[in-house]
Curated annotation (Swiss-Prot):
Its cofactor is Zn(2+). Zn(2+) 1 binds at H111, H113, H191, D212. Keywords: Hydrolase, Metal-binding, Phosphoprotein, Zinc. It holds the Pfam family Lactamase_B. CDD domains: YtnP-like_MBL-fold. This is Probable quorum-quenching lactonase YtnP. The gene is ytnP. Its EC number is 3.1.1.-. Zn(2+) 2 binds at D115, H116, D212, H257. Binds 2 Zn(2+) ions per subunit. GO terms for molecular function: hydrolase activity; metal ion binding. PANTHER family: QUORUM-QUENCHING LACTONASE YTNP-RELATED (PTHR42978:SF6), QUORUM-QUENCHING LACTONASE YTNP-RELATED-RELATED (PTHR42978).
Length: 281
């Protein structure tokens, strides 16, 4: 597992499974001859997208960003459609760190689409139960409302199987939430109406998790937004805002979906200054 430090904050990437989504959907109106130069694509026009939760450890707290694809939650048809070739191994990942799911204090849900929220619940016999029974689950109030009352478009990604069993653990926020000193969530909208980003700051160092406003390093251009985005004209200025914040702080960007990089810093000209590459198994 890859790990890095932001000041006294430790970040570790867990194994949350993998999807292979349509490249055209992931890059929206950007022509394939452009995006395919920046991110690998297979013969089915799919790109590899990890669904790997990021464990944040600070002040004795164990915090996870998003929950992975889950295990035993998807039908064969769903696995085919979403290119799922491996389900979540979050429990073994935690065990390798001397932790269990019961040790997780907080889950910071940037949004509640299935590829981020399936790992919140699991089947115990015929019944769905919480995977992280002791955790507070934070998400924006808008996202929580969207999850429980999806519209004709969003019902394909907001599933009751992912929220009903954990409803009692959820706490919402409006604009900004401080999880603990130096770790904050900020409602952005864009990808979904309730989408949020997460910032880690400690000892003069900063990491920015743009979540699905910038799911991979290839989405750095503010105009390269997803066809999946419900509000692309919100995504663009929010990307600009948080990229400017990151540039001012010389921040790292950390990724949940990227198959190549766990984290990186960019130079002003767009070249990569430093990186933590994903160790491919």
């Amino acid at each position: 597992m890859e790990t890095m430090k932001i000041g006294n904050i430790t970040l570790t990437w867990l194994d949350g499974g993998v999807t292979h989504m349509d490249g055209g959907a992931m890059f929206g109106v950007v022509p394939k001859p452009l995006w395919s130069k920046k991110y690998p694509v297979n013969e089915k026009n799919q790109i590899e997208l990890r669904t790997d939760p990021i464990l944040i450890q600070k002040d004795g707290l164990n915090i996870i960003i998003d929950a992975g694809i889950g295990y035993g939650k998807l039908t064969d048809k769903q696995k085919r459609n979403y290119g799922v070739t491996q389900e979540s191994n979050v429990k073994p990942s935690l065990a390798a760190l001397g932790l269990t799911v019961a040790d997780i204090d907080v889950i910071a849900m940037t949004h509640l689409h299935f590829d981020h929220a399936c790992g919140l619940t699991e089947y115990e016999g015929e019944r769905l139960v919480s995977v992280f029974p002791n955790a507070v689950i934070y998400t924006s109030a808008v996202e929580w409302d969207e999850m429980r009352h999806p519209n004709i478009r969003s019902k394909n990604t907001y599933w009751k199987e992912n929220w009903e069993a954990v409803a009692g653990q959820v706490k919402t926020f409006e604009d900004t939430l401080t999880i603990t000193e130096g770790i904050t969530m900020h409602h952005t909208g864009g990808h979904s109406d309730g989408h949020s980003v997460l910032i880690c700051e400690d000892a003069g160092e900063t990491a920015v998790h743009m979540a699905d406003l910038m799911p991979t390093h290839a989405h750095r251009n503010p105009l390269w937004v997803l066809a999946y985005d419900d509000y692309p004209m919100t995504s663009i200025p929010q990307k600009q805002k948080w990229q400017a914040f990151a540039a001012e702080k010389d921040a790292w960007f950390i990724f949940y979906h990227d198959a190549e990089y766990r984290a990186l810093q960019w130079e002003e000209d767009g070249s990569i200054k430093k990186s933590v590459k994903r160790m491919k198994r």
